[in-house]
């Protein structure tokens, strides 16, 4: 990791709905920092700074959290958005120990056009993420799946994913993506109409 990002936050005293509304009015996002020792620290975060960090880091990049001068490595664990306005309403930050593996949800990116879809098949994507057991500093941001060589009836399972050393798939072996024959359509050849 060449240069780690930093997010500055302040501890917050007021808890509850009223205090959180006041924070949001001041363009701040209420949140909780769960540190690696098990402490929960309520924090207030500048909304614009959080949005910029989330665009870059997402949920799979470790960054430094600066809480009034104390720094800790962490991940965005969960984030809540307003239902129809473009801002965050709450964030959970998870402090990590860089030497201990964690379970993380890594997004999957399907690339290419399957050969089977060019002759009428349908691409069915069953899952757009996979749970991986890995150290926080080497966590992949996304896992690419190239489907260019998939024929009709082919499928990609979790066991088919190729990961770097040190990463372990946490999930059982299920189908991620499949190219299947189109539904309905004409009957089989030789069938009377």
From Swiss-Prot:
Record carries keyword Secreted: no
Domain of life: Bacteria
Gene Ontology biological process: translation
Annotated GO MF terms: 5S rRNA binding; structural constituent of ribosome
InterPro entries xrefs: Rbsml_bL25/Gln-tRNA_synth_N, Ribosomal_bL25/Gln-tRNA_synth, Ribosomal_bL25_b-dom, Ribosomal_bL25_C, Ribosomal_bL25_long, Ribosomal_L25_dom, Ribosomal_uL5_bac-type
Keyword tags: Ribonucleoprotein, Ribosomal protein, RNA-binding, rRNA-binding
PANTHER family: RIBOSOMAL PROTEIN L25/GLN-TRNA SYNTHETASE, ANTI-CODON-BINDING DOMAIN-CONTAINING PROTEIN (PTHR33284), RIBOSOMAL PROTEIN L25_GLN-TRNA SYNTHETASE, ANTI-CODON-BINDING DOMAIN-CONTAINING PROTEIN (PTHR33284:SF1)
Role this protein plays: This is one of the proteins that binds to the 5S RNA in the ribosome where it forms part of the central protuberance.
NCBIfam families linked to this entry: bL25_bact_ctc, PRK05618.3-1
Family: Belongs to the bacterial ribosomal protein bL25 family. CTC subfamily.
Name of the protein in question: Large ribosomal subunit protein bL25
Name of the gene this protein is made from: rplY
